[in-house]
Structure formats: structure tokens, C-alpha cells
């Protein structure tokens, strides 16, 4: 995947992204509603096995700094059905980067991959739910 927006590039992860990804996954506050923060070795293992090996996620790169500031889970779970999720570097929260890059991935799913459904699950506070609504997602299920 390679998508460019005004301020972001969404692309596949590379091994060189380990330090930037660790700034995200190694931060206690960022990870508080997911799982315990990763040490650097666990970040590298996750990057290699899941992000690169299984192509289970894409990198959200800040154009101006060329820094990976976000991790976007993007998996096909059934024909035409994609799961997505996101975690962003805390230094870049509340500046519209998550919306801009996630919107681009959703648009890509519907226009290029002929998706008929893209969904996300929220386990944290209202931050993710608010973004989901802004992205046009609707509450479904319990």
C-alpha cells in the first residue's frame, strides 16, 4: 500500500521503522488501553513478524519529518471486509493526523479493494470512538 495525503504517507512498514514504532508502542500512556508498553526487542519482533511478515499493518508517516507517527492495523478478515485500528505517537495527538491517514486508508479500501465493510473496535476512552464517528463509522452490536 502506498497512499499520499496532504501531510501524510501511508506505506508498508520496513525494518528501519523500528525506532519510530517503538516511540509509539513503548510509551506507557499511549498503550494504557491496549496492553503493557513494549520493550525495544518486543517492538522489533512485532514489526518483523506482524507488520512486515504478515502485512498486518501499515505505517503512517509524517511527510515533513519523514517519521513514522502512526501504526494502522489493516487486515482483510473476510472477502470485502477489513478490520482497522490505530495507535499514534502521543506527540502528534489532536492535530488531525490520525483522521487524515485513516480516512485515506478507508477510501483506498472502498475504491481500490472494493471493500463493502471496514470496521474498528474501541476499547479505550472516547478518543477512538470520536474518531470513528468522524470517519463515518456507525455503532454496531453491543
Model regions: which residues?
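Acyl-donor (CoA/ACP) binding surface of acyl/acetyltransferases
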Residues: 1-33, 61-142
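Conserved GNAT-fold acetyl-CoA-binding loop/helix
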Residues: 29-49
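Juxtamembrane/interface motifs at transmembrane-helix termini
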Residues: 40-44, 52-53, 89-91, 121
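Short amphipathic alpha-helical patches
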Residues: 44-49, 54, 74, 132-133
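A short helix-loop-beta-strand connector motif used in the catalytic cores of GNAT acetyltransferases and
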Residues: 48-61, 68-70
Amino acid at each position: 500500500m502506498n497512499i499520499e495525503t496532504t501531510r501524510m504517507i501511508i506505506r508498508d512498514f520496513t525494518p528501519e521503522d523500528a525506532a519510530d514504532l517503538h516511540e509509539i508502542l513503548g510509551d506507557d500512556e499511549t498503550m494504557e488501553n491496549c496492553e503493557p508498553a513494549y520493550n525495544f526487542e518486543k517492538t522489533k519482533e512485532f514489526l518483523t513478524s506482524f507488520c512486515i511478515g504478515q502485512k498486518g499493518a501499515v505505517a503512517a508517516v509524517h511527510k515533513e519529518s519523514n517519521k513514522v507517527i502512526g501504526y494502522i492495523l489493516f487486515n482483510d478478515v473476510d472477502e470485502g471486509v477489513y478490520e482497522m485500528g490505530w495507535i499514534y505517537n502521543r506527540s502528534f495527538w489532536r492535530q488531525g493526523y490520525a483522521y487524515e491517514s485513516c480516512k485515506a486508508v478507508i477510501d483506498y479500501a472502498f475504491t481500490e479493494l472494493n471493500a463493502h465493510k471496514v470496521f474498528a473496535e474501541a476499547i479505550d476512552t472516547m478518543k477512538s470512538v470520536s474518531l470513528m464517528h468522524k470517519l463515518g463509522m456507525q455503532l454496531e452490536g453491543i
